[in-house]
Amino acid sequence: MRSTHDEAPVAGRRIRLGSSQFLVIDLTEPLDLDVEVFPGDPKPQKEIFSDIDETGYQHHVYRLGDHNFHPHGDAPSHQNADLKHLGFEAFDLSFCFNSAFMTDLSGSAEAVESDGIRFLTRVEKKHLEASANVLSKVGAVVIRTGYDEWLEINKPHSPETIPYLAEDASKFLSQFPNIKVVGIDSITIDPPEKHVSHIQLKDKLIVESLVHLHDIPEVAKSRFDLQTAPIRIVGATGGPVAAYAFVEV
């Protein structure tokens, strides 16, 4: 079990694009059939459709929830009855590549600690409003509560401690029309049986279950480039997102 950043390998590699060099940090995880899901949701299942020893080729069929992936995005239809006709195919290229700002709230005084991992469970407007100036200049905001480390060690989720946005926080973020993407390291952006953030942020791509956010260098948190490319499944209420942070070095 990993509980400190020092023991973790850096989830990134250096690449060159034109005359610039970037550290690219992978904010995704491979999907395992044993992934811990939202309490009450079914886990992924695999069926062997064709076995290579019998047919000469291998082919598997999977039964997956729209929201099993780390990370995943939410379609407009997921928790908004007025938009139930809009599936995950609704997001175009404007949601895929954006300048980004990350606020790291894992060290907040209100953060709780469990199994050596500190995370903030309730994100409020007061945690965000000091960043209003930079939020007005980026296309994506990423909220790190510290729960990314919980996701990475695949521990069961408890509804009482899953991080979420308070109503005043989601209302605050909704006031920035330039923001196309709102990302968080929680498996949901709303508290249980509430849909406020999904309604107030209905015109944005909500990306949940981001991982490895702690690998984004401190000096880059105020401005980096973010890829959040949704795998556009027609009619789905959500789906996997290929998410990478690009930090110029």
PLM-predicted stretches and their roles:
Residues M1-V249:
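Active-/binding-site microenvironments in catalytic and ligand-binding cores
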